[in-house]
């Protein structure tokens, strides 16, 4: 990498030295100088559409948009000159001309970027008469509502849908003041590819796109609590927004696995149950005479449970008892459960529902690598890689945020190999789709390794210094020619060869697998085969 070129500029009289690759806006942010924006999203929407970020650069005969203008040596920049302020006030006047300003009835009042800027620049009502057409709200989507009259056409939602979530659902229709976001939240929303992830609503600076489960609040009067999504194992982080001890909203955090993204489950299914009227608020004990559950105290409930456990243990022995934990329970809760079962019950009958899904991974990777866990963080396997091999996994449904990041990778040019009997959503973007006969994952992997070895693509240095048992593996896979594997797996042998060459020749090529590999009678062997394939070409842990 070359040395960073530094540039000297002056912003509002403050001399600073910055990386020459930065924009004026980024340079100002590093210097803690505030420049207002409406449409800007870093690396996603740097189009300068709203013109709120304009600044005055000495020597220029016009204002420039700071979000997409690079710094230059000796630049003298003014962010608050009379000319700049007049321009921003004019922008706000034009935006408010076609904007419904009944803020008190808007769910985003108090958390609206347009409202904040209008108050800051003293523009509460436009001096112009708007000419935009009137459109009815689109409310049929169960999670999201679109209010066209509140839209300022900043394009943040469109860019987020197409470049971040990479779902390609939101588009523009019409032009000029009649430009409208084609949001599929009307009666036909089910017929679109919209995943209702809500990432579009997250970036909306007004109340045009809103989540239906979001309750009205003012930003300065709430508490935000960082936590982890309880649904899948991606580990997305978000903030629960709490007002008067009630959760009113959820905001994504820039966590290592989700990077400000959330899926429909994380955004819309993560907190409503907390205050649900259907939740039990106290213990219930069944009345033997009436057969109905009746309210009890905690002491009564715990005494009953403890006495039953003692009774069973005394009559049938410790092994008549067991503890079974939920995979969504925190590690601390699972630890306390097994402690109680082993110490109080006197048995090792402890289990967790995740064992059925993931014991094959723990056993298989522990045997081949010494650790039963993934070798790289999610950011490694979806960023800056050449090929992704997706085996027995449908992340768009099971782990949607990972699915979004894989779509991002494909948009950036990463090649995709899908190995799955099903026509999953990502197979539409795949360079190769191998539709294996279910249960033939080991044969598939052996066939891949057969081609890799015969083509001389094995990483001999990695094998010699980092592995053992290669000669035995080589002898086993020798029989798994593409033609034999094609008969076992019901695939085209040429497609198998093509996939093997694409995978082996790539510099960085992670393998992402899921329950399609593990939930078989040969699940552990399937995991070991995936691991062997990665070691054969020396791609283990590369990022």
Predicted regions located by residue number:
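Short, surface-exposed charged micro-motifs
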Residues: 15, 169, 237-239
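Short, contiguous acidic and Ser/Thr-rich linear segments
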Residues: 14-22
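Fe-S ferredoxin-like electron-transfer domains
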Residues: 51-197, 202-228, 243-246
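Catalytic alpha/large subunits of respiratory electron-transfer oxidoreductases
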Residues: 100, 215-543
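Short, structural beta-strand-to-alpha-helix junction motif
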Residues: 8, 22-26, 70, 330
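A basic, amphipathic helix-loop patch mediating RNA/tRNA/ribosome contacts
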Residues: 24-58
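Active-site phosphate-binding and catalytic loops of NTP-dependent enzymes
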Residues: 34-41, 214, 538-541
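Eukaryote-biased recognition of intrinsically disordered, low-complexity regulatory segments
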Residues: 4-14
